[in-house]
A protein has these predicted regions:
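Conserved catalytic core of the tyrosine transesterase superfamily
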Residues: 1-323
Length: 323
């Protein structure tokens, strides 16, 4: 316990997150909210605080900052983790904060023609990634973090590892992307071979694999499908290595393509995933199949796309057209 007290709180948080095998994304989110919580209460140590202070912070987020329900839930999860896993001080009783309202918004969906227009305005690696977002229904993070071993060309499928909810799932590999993807991987392989010759070529391995198999990170199958152009030091181990392409890079490319195409909708990388689901339903695929491809735990989440199909000009005939 003395050693734990000597360490800074955020170091202990990172170590606990690492032991739980949480993603780097979750780590940064939890650190962010724990910092916000401490600063909100004038830098008091969390051990000096409890339910009342958590309620005050979460209510502040809902009322003053007007965060979404999902953002407030993430902040709450971070604090629960802090008290339970780091401080060994589980919270007693309910947290009676004012909860943020979950807005009822329909996702932005492109028509098939609009999707084609935007993709036509993209080329190279970004164009290939956009086609995967739409053609396979990938989340942005799933696309950029994909590894060579996750693509099964023989079965025409992509295995999404540790997706949302820490579950694997399988989605389709479009026939039309097989050759472009194979050609792209040949270029990536040449880059990897150059890195190996320079004494590098190692990528970050998930969970404890790096310790169990020290040399595995240099293997071809573990390399990222869409590697970054530059080497960078790992935030956890400080090792200089090639990471995956930044999400921001692809986001900017999609936004630019949407502007060039003249589509007057708020288009993001997520829009391709929404369009993938909607177009499958339009083509007659059943809701359960779409649910599995998207990786939704609850079919109610997938049902939002049926609401899109049942609303708007294609589903209802305006009375003015009957005059």
């Amino acid at each position: 316990m003395e050693n734990r007290q000597k360490k800074k709180l955020l170091v202990l948080v990172r170590e606990a997150i690492y032991r739980k095998h949480y993603s780097k994304r979750t780590e940064e989110a939890y650190i962010h909210w724990i910092k916000r919580y401490i600063f909100f209460h004038n830098k008091r140590h969390p051990l000096e605080m409890g339910n009342a202070e958590i309620e005050g912070f979460l209510t502040h987020l809902a009322i003053k900052k007007r965060v979404s329900a999902s953002t407030q839930n993430q902040a709450f999860s971070a604090l629960l983790f802090l008290y339970r896993e780091v401080l060994n001080k589980p919270l007693e009783g309910p947290i009676n904060s004012l909860r943020a309202k979950r807005p009822k918004r329909l996702p932005t969906v492109l028509t098939k023609e609009e999707t084609f227009k935007i993709i036509q305005c993209m080329s190279g690696v970004h164009g290939l990634m956009a086609k995967l977002l739409y053609g396979s229904g990938l989340r942005l993070s799933e696309c950029v973090e994909m590894r060579v071993k996750d693509i099964d060309f023989a079965q025409r499928q992509i295995i999404i590892r540790d997706a949302k909810g820490m579950q694997d799932r399988v989605t389709i590999l479009p026939e039309g992307l097989v050759k472009p993807l194979q050609e792209h991987l040949e270029r990536v392989k040449r880059l990897h071979q150059k890195d190996l010759k320079k004494g590098g070529g190692s990528v970050y391995l998930p969970f404890a694999l790096g310790r169990k198999y020290p040399g595995a990170g240099r293997g071809w199958v573990w390399q990222y499908v869409f590697p970054s152009a530059r080497l960078a030091r790992g935030p956890r181990d400080g090792v200089l290595r090639r990471w995956y392409m930044s999400e921001t890079t692809l986001q900017r490319a999609v936004h630019k393509a949407a502007r060039l195409s003249g589509i007057n909708k708020r288009v993001s990388c997520r829009t391709f995933r929404h369009s993938f689901a909607t177009h499958l339903l339009q083509n007659g695929y059943d809701i359960r199949t779409v649910q599995e491809l998207l990786g939704h735990k609850d079919v109610k989440t997938t049902m939002i796309y049926t609401h899109i199909l049942n609303r708007g000009g294609l589903a209802v005939r305006s009375p003015i057209d009957m005059l």
